[in-house]
């Protein structure tokens, strides 16, 4: 049981004069702050920091850490997020002094090992995706999307076709797709999915035209279904003068099985913090490398790592058609090291097994859960699948209630209410790293909740029951966030 002291904010635990650490006596001449900083940077009053003991501080943050949920302490079936286990060997490699203690301004000759790793990673990601060249600069998936779209825009402008400003996006797409297009100065055209949950080919034919810049597509899509008409779709877009952009959010389903470049895509971004065990969460850092076909290679961000004839590596900045830098320095190096470690550890056969097992796990879960939840698209899925809580909704229980009830059993809920085209949506992605026993335990809980919806719906409607914080006013929290401590008047 948690007591009030453990639940208190650290500011509420503060007592004037309580000291957590004593600094040693000053052994250098004291200098007035005003002689070092301009007046506008100097506080007029001391910062109102909490005054607590070191033990209080340790216990407070240890308690908060226990309330966190992550892949290292529980199943995390968050759809379209690939919350897989992050092998700890990657952490060991990233902490090698030759990597961890490098500085981006070091002379090239002093960081040849780091440059070689980046060069090899560029080559390997290009091979995995079927692309001809890769940039490692983008800091995350959405940054990769924007980078790819800026290159597409530069490509059309270089051909005197600046009027190509329309980006076609399926209605099942990630929300970052239209957002990235808008930031890149492009307009979005949304097309419908058909009864299969796939892009409506006729809708695509009707949408393309002389103003088409690109089609943005996730394959498999956000419903976890493979876009089986992709070759025909690529032909339609290319014949209209547009390019194909591959959102790599769901690449965990196709490693070693299929490559975007072979499907007809011209540019692709990958989420290294998802597919290649970055890790991710907590706001970052992430990494969203972008691969391109030769038609877009001149527009890659500068610099990229290149190799000289003598075998040494250097930063190639002589790229006159480049869209320029997209990030300070040269990418989130630590995440790139972890991804490289993962690829080298797994090898081609290991990466193939990753996707095979991810797809197998998703289909196993889908079939068992379809006995209690509505399955809107009854066909083989890839790495993730979508259920609907419409049956439970008829009983007065919403998908949100089901998600809250899962918290009582120690599970992070799946993605809910996305994609938007499925009513009362539950999107579940088990990943390849979970055992069958773990999957069965989660399935059994989901089936129990389905029974509760029928027999004792109030238990689900009022969940969670065992968490420190119960139901929040989520709408007000989103619209009127309180982001700092505000003492009671």
From Swiss-Prot:
Keywords, in A-Z order: Oxidoreductase, Pyridoxal phosphate
The reaction(s) this protein catalyses: N(6)-[(R)-lipoyl]-L-lysyl-[glycine-cleavage complex H protein] + glycine + H(+) = N(6)-[(R)-S(8)-aminomethyldihydrolipoyl]-L-lysyl-[glycine-cleavage complex H protein] + CO2
Cross-referenced InterPro entries: GcvPB, GDC-P_C, GDC-P_N, GDC_P, PyrdxlP-dep_Trfase, PyrdxlP-dep_Trfase_major, PyrdxlP-dep_Trfase_small
Gene3D superfamilies reported for this sequence: 6.20.440.10, Aspartate Aminotransferase, domain 1 (3.90.1150.10), Type I PLP-dependent aspartate aminotransferase-like (Major domain) (3.40.640.10)
Residue numbers of N6-(pyridoxal phosphate)lysine PTMs: 274
GO molecular function: glycine binding; glycine dehydrogenase (decarboxylating) activity; pyridoxal phosphate binding
Cofactor: pyridoxal 5'-phosphate
Cellular component GO terms held in the UniProt record: cytosol; glycine cleavage complex
Function (record text): The glycine cleavage system catalyzes the degradation of glycine. The P protein binds the alpha-amino group of glycine through its pyridoxal phosphate cofactor; CO(2) is released and the remaining methylamine moiety is then transferred to the lipoamide cofactor of the H protein.
Quaternary state and interactors: The glycine cleavage system is composed of four proteins: P, T, L and H. In this organism, the P 'protein' is a heterodimer of two subunits.
Name by which UniProt lists this protein: Probable glycine dehydrogenase (decarboxylating) subunit 2
Gene that specifies this protein: gcvPB
């Amino acid at each position: 049981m948690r007591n009030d002291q453990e639940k208190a904010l650290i500011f509420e635990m503060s007592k004037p004069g309580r000291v957590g650490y004593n600094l040693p006596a000053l052994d250098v001449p004291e200098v007035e702050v005003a002689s070092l900083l301009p007046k506008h940077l100097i506080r007029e009053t001391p910062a109102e920091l909490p005054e607590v003991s070191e033990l209080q501080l340790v216990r407070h943050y240890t308690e908060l850490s226990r309330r966190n949920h992550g892949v290292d302490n529980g199943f995390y079936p968050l759809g379209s997020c690939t919350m897989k286990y992050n092998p700890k060997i990657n952490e060991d490699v990233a902490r090698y002094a030759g990597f961890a203690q490098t500085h981006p301004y070091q002379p090239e000759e002093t960081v040849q090992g780091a440059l070689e790793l980046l060069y090899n990673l560029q080559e390997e990601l290009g091979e995995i995706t079927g692309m001809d060249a890769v940039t490692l600069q983008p800091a995350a998936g959405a940054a990769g999307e924007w980078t790819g779209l800026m290159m597409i825009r530069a490509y059309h402008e270089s051909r005197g076709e600046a009027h190509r400003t329309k980006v076609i996006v399926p209605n099942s797409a990630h929300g970052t797709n239209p957002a990235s297009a808008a930031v890149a100065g492009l307009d979005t055209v949304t097309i419908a999915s058909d009864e299969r949950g796939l892009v409506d080919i006729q809708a695509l034919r009707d949408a393309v035209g002389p103003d088409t810049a690109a089609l943005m597509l996730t394959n498999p899509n956000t419903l976890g279904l493979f876009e089986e008409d992709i070759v025909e779709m690529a032909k339609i877009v290319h014949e209209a003068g547009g390019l194909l952009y591959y959102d790599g959010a769901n690449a965990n389903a196709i490693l070693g099985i299929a490559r975007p470049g072979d499907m007809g895509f011209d540019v692709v971004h990958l989420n290294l913090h998802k597919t290649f065990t970055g890790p991710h969460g907590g706001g970052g850092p992430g990494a969203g490398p972008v691969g391109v076909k030769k038609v877009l290679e001149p527009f890659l961000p500068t610099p990229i790592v290149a190799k000289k004839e003598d075998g040494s590596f250097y930063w190639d900045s002589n790229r006159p058609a480049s869209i320029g830098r997209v990030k300070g320095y040269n990418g989130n190096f630590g995440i790139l090291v972890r991804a490289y470690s993962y690829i080298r550890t797994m090898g081609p056969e290991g990466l193939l097994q990753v996707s095979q097992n991810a797809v197998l796990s998703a289909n196993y879960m889908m079939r068992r859960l379809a006995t209690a939840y509505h399955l809107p698209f009854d066909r083989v899925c890839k790495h993730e699948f979508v259920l609907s809580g419409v049956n439970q909704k008829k009983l007065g229980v919403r998908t949100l209630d089901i998600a809250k009830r899962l918290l009582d059993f120690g599970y992070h809920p799946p993605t809910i209410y996305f994609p938007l085209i499925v009513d009362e949506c539950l999107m579940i992605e088990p990943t390849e790293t979970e055992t069958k026993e773990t999957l069965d335990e989660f399935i059994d809980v989901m089936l129990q909740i389905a029974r509760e919806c029928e027999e004792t719906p109030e238990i689900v409607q009022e969940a969670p029951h065992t968490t420190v914080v119960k139901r929040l006013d989520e709408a007000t929290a989103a619209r009127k966030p309180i982001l700092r401590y505000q003492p009671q008047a």
